[in-house]
């Protein structure tokens, strides 16, 4: 079942509960026999976004099986003191609002109970008798963990039936967990739609087995690995080994930004060796001129519009008096540098998707508050589902074109979620 189907199923279940008639409420929840009789009520205090509400919950007795059950409410989970709206607000503030559990609890507490920070917001001292809301960070943490468990349950066929371009990008993020533990989270993203497949937490990214887990997780979520054509990455050897062993038809596009990181020191060393016999302004001018020449030649290779132009630029670099070492370094990588320019790889990015981790770190604290890999993985799965449902910010500029302006990755993939949210998919 896809993630959108899960959300629609949850909404349908809530609508059925909310629209039950008095006769339908008398159908036993245990054996399904109709005709249960009322069996008293009990008081229940439920805190909603408007504050605590003192209610009485009806109980029923089944004549056939002899068991009792309480009336179901769609707006509050069974055996919960806070409504679904409060839980959804708290989880959304943690995932999307990019704040800590303690601050989430404080903000929700202040808003519901008109206490603490609420007095600062209204700009006056409002007298209150007692504390109306006692929401604690540990309660928010428990809600978050339950949502993470639902996110992990939804991995199977999560993105089934959702179109993919076959051009992917992948990257990993290291983290220091509590107790001096370390781990790395690997993510696979569709370069055209921005859709992120469920991430996976592994011990390291040096081996092919770790990356194989990532592709297995994506296949479990509904990705047809046979349709994957290209993968943009930073040149991790573990990924390259994995592609050679298991996915020989997939081309690895090298990230241009990481190539510049490797080429920069080489260019600097060649230039400094060449101007070693010069001093003062003469050395500075010669150094700047040589750097411009070499970087310009390298730019022509990395920014080539076609493979033929890339080969011509590589020949020009090799002909330069200082360019042979650089040309020898680039020549074995030329295919991996220019895969994105080939007609069969339209949409393949030339830069790895490292920018997604900026969003992840801002939202879930980069693992500092996670004591184990399981907790961190649940947080990453929550973030990925939220990412796929959340539309990008609407932007319009004269000099830049935003491909996903105002659209979510699911909408870019041809499956707009509409009014369905990621919280519905998590059954919160």
Regions found by a protein language model. Give the residues of each.
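Extended amphipathic alpha-helical interaction segments
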Residues: 2-8, 17, 224-232, 239-376, ...
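Short Cys/His-rich Zn2+-coordinating modules
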Residues: 3-16, 38-50
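Short, flexible, mixed-charge glycine/proline-rich loop motifs
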Residues: 14-25, 50-56
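Cys/His-enriched microdomains
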Residues: 26-29, 60
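Short, cysteine/histidine-rich loop/knuckle motifs that typically chelate Zn2+
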Residues: 29-33, 64
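Basic, short loop/linker segments at the boundary and entry of helix-turn-helix/winged-helix-like folds
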Residues: 37-95
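RNase H-like nuclease fold core
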Residues: 61, 113-232, 237, 241-249
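Basic, amphipathic alpha-helical segments enriched in Lys/Arg and hydrophobic/aromatic residues
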Residues: 362-428
